[in-house]
Amino acid sequence: MTGPLTAPGLTGMADAVLHEVASLAARHGETGDTAAIELTSIPLTRLDREDIVIRLGRGEVEATIDSAGRSEVWETSYAGVWLVRHLGLDGKVATETIEICAAPLILFSHPDDRRAAAARLGEDLRAKAAPAA
């Protein structure tokens, strides 16, 4: 983790949030319990949020989801600590969450979608295998 920013506009809340992340990550490693910290519900300044994001860094995994707005997901430089950012249709941050888990649920397809996709794939394969008329 890089050091904290020192600038006007920082309230010290970034340190408190990061200590909570460290505690939750340790618990996740021991018990598998998952947790989330909704950053947009905490009285953070813009600089506080930037400080948190910078200090957590970026890891090797990231994804973008385009569904009812855009969502950006990335694992931080700490395995199991993810940042999930949902943007409104105007492109502004609607919610920003730190999730402590193996992978955020937003990355998992819904069971109904998986069943429909399996059926569609089977139909596509049967149609391709059918002799041309």
Region locations from a protein language model:
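Short, structured protein-protein interaction patches enriched in aromatics and acidic/basic residues
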Residues: 38-40, 44, 61-90
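Short, intrinsically disordered, mixed-charge
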Residues: 54-61
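Helix-rich interaction surfaces within compact, conserved domain-sized segments
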Residues: 74-133
